[in-house]
A protein has these predicted regions:
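Conserved glycine-rich cofactor-binding loop
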Residues: 9, 14-17
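Substrate-binding pocket helix/loop in short-chain dehydrogenase/reductase
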Residues: 71, 99-100, 104-112, 138, ...
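Short, small/polar-rich loop/turn modules that mediate ligand/substrate recognition or access, typified
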Residues: 89, 175, 180, 246-248
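Active-site helix of classical SDR
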Residues: 123, 159, 167
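Alpha-helical segment proximal to the catalytic Tyr-Lys
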Residues: 128, 172-173, 244
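Residue(s) in the substrate-gating loop at a strand-loop-helix junction
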Residues: 143
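Short C-terminal tail/terminal secondary-structure segment
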Residues: 148, 236, 247-262
Length: 262
């Protein structure tokens, strides 16, 4: 399917691996020019080269999105390089796990900075450019915890719900400017983050990591862990004109894990 993204410019954060990379790959396959950022410079530039092999232009910016001014710098560098900005995919790493009593105020602040405020700052920097051209796509990668809290991830559950509220509010404010805003909420996908959480669970439960992964699969109605590319495909669709009537929603990519109706 040709999604009509050739000539569009997409900025994707935390894109050197995992879900961010999967989003960047799908956008590149559809012909979009990319700006990607991540903290690890070596992995970032390796990803840049591989994405360029898919045919489009790729700007790589080694940045930590939590550092002051980096979200704005990332957007500025993207617009400076390409002269426009059409799509922003806001993606960051997951928060520290643990029950409520183990988290300090600083833990909550750190999670809010990384998982909520980076989304706020990327959107704030991007929206004026999108308004100017009368078209834009804001896509926030969060977690199914924005729909259904995950045990042991209380700081993340709190921040992810905030991003869902941000996106819904932006969808209402920006709808007359041709800008859509949506959340993509992954469940268990084949990423380093999933294996890290499985490793922590295995230690607490006294089982192996492989056994923890099998238990995780059994909790998913489809009885398997998803592929990052399956999320990337949805993001590419939401970034396209074909998704022009979809805004203000949160879509789970979770194999049916979330049991709620909404």
């Amino acid at each position: 399917m040709d999604l009509g993204l050739k000539g569009r410019v997409a900025a994707v954060s935390a894109a050197s691996k995992g879900l961010g990379r999967a989003c960047a790959e799908e956008l590149a396959r559809e012909g979009a020019d990319l700006a990607i950022c991540a903290r690890g410079e070596d992995a970032l530039h390796a990803t840049q080269k591989e994405l360029e092999e898919l045919g489009g232009r790729v700007l790589a910016a080694p940045l930590d999105m939590v550092e002051p001014g980096t979200c704005e710098r990332f957007i500025d560098e993207t617009v400076s390089a390409y002269g426009r900005l059409d799509i922003v995919v806001s993606n960051v790493g997951g928060p520290k796990a643990g029950p409520f009593e183990t988290h300090s105020d600083d833990d909550f602040r750190e999670t809010m900075e990384r998982n909520l405020m980076t989304a706020v700052r990327l959107a704030r920097a991007a929206v004026p450019h999108m308004k100017q051209q009368g078209w834009g796509r804001l896509i926030f990668i969060t977690s199914i915890s924005s729909k259904q809290p995950i045990e042991g991830l209380i700081t993340g559950n709190t921040a992810r719900a905030g991003v869902a509220g941000l996106s819904k509010s932006l969808s209402l404010e920006l709808v007359t400017h041709g800008i859509t805003s949506n959340v993509v909420a992954p469940g268990s996908l084949l990423t380093d983050r999933t294996y890290d959480l499985a490793s922590q669970f295995s230690k607490n439960a006294g089982i192996t990591v492989d056994e923890a992964i099998k238990r995780l699969e059994q909790d998913i109605p489809m009885k398997r862990i998803g592929k990052p590319a399956e999320l990337g495909a949805l993001v590419a669709f939401l970034a396209s004109e074909r998704a022009s009537f979809i805004t203000g929603t949160t879509i789970a990519v979770d194999g049916g894990t979330v049991r709620g109706l909404l």
